[in-house]
């Protein structure tokens, strides 16, 4: 009886990490103006969520730079428009834009960047979009982020 109890306890402990919420995602932005995903789900049990962005392409950031920006769906176009006006030296983001929930820096070929944000900034039922603010990229490089 004790052996069975010990075996069940051990299996429970070993499977716990498999049931834990995934509180990060790895995303790539390539030279074809594409993210490798168009949907991210954030588990509401996560206190923080991390996005790891990489650029496996060959082009530099002044030609094919990518960033990862999160806002509400309603704010996306305004963030993109104001970002284009801000220019390359500001990573195509308006400084201190309150509509931006989280963002990485602009990266080019072979570069990486990460951003971690508090999940408490997200509201269940709100529509969120992630996108790239490099001029012209948001038409293709975008996706949804959902809190569940």
Curated annotation (Swiss-Prot):
The lineage of its organism: Bacteria, Pseudomonadati, Pseudomonadota, Gammaproteobacteria, Pseudomonadales. CDD domains: Azurin. InterPro entries: Azurin, BlueCu_1, BlueCu_1_BS, Cu-binding_ET, Cupredoxin. Disulfide bonds join 23-46. It holds the Pfam family Copper-bind. GO terms for cellular component: periplasmic space; plasma membrane. It comes from Pseudomonas aeruginosa (strain ATCC 15692 / DSM 22644 / CIP 104116 / JCM 14847 / LMG 12228 / 1C / PRS 101 / PAO1). Residues 21-148 form the Plastocyanin-like domain. This is Azurin. GO terms for molecular function: copper ion binding; electron transfer activity; identical protein binding; transition metal ion binding; zinc ion binding. Cu cation binds at residues 66, 132, 137, 141. It comes from the Bacteria. Transfers electrons from cytochrome c551 to cytochrome oxidase. Residues 1-20 form the signal peptide. NCBIfam families: azurin (TIGR02695). It is found in: Periplasm. Keywords: Copper, Disulfide bond, Electron transport, Metal-binding, Periplasm, Signal, Transport. SUPFAM superfamilies: Cupredoxins (SSF49503).
């Amino acid at each position: 009886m004790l052996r069975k109890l010990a075996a069940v306890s051990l299996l429970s402990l070993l499977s716990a990490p498999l049931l834990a919420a995934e509180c990060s995602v790895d995303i790539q932005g390539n030279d074809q103006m594409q993210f490798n995903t168009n949907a991210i789900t954030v588990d509401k049990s996560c206190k923080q969520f991390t996005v790891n962005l990489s650029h496996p392409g060959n082009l530099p950031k002044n030609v094919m730079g990518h960033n990862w920006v999160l806002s509400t769906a309603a704010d996306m176009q305004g963030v993109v428009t104001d970002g284009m006006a801000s220019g390359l030296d500001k990573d195509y983001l308006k400084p201190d834009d309150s509509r931006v929930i989280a963002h990485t820096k602009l990266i080019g070929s072979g570069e990486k960047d990460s951003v971690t944000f508090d999940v408490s900034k997200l509201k269940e039922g709100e529509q969120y979009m992630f996108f790239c603010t490099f001029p012209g990229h948001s038409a293709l490089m975008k996706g949804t982020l959902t809190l569940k």
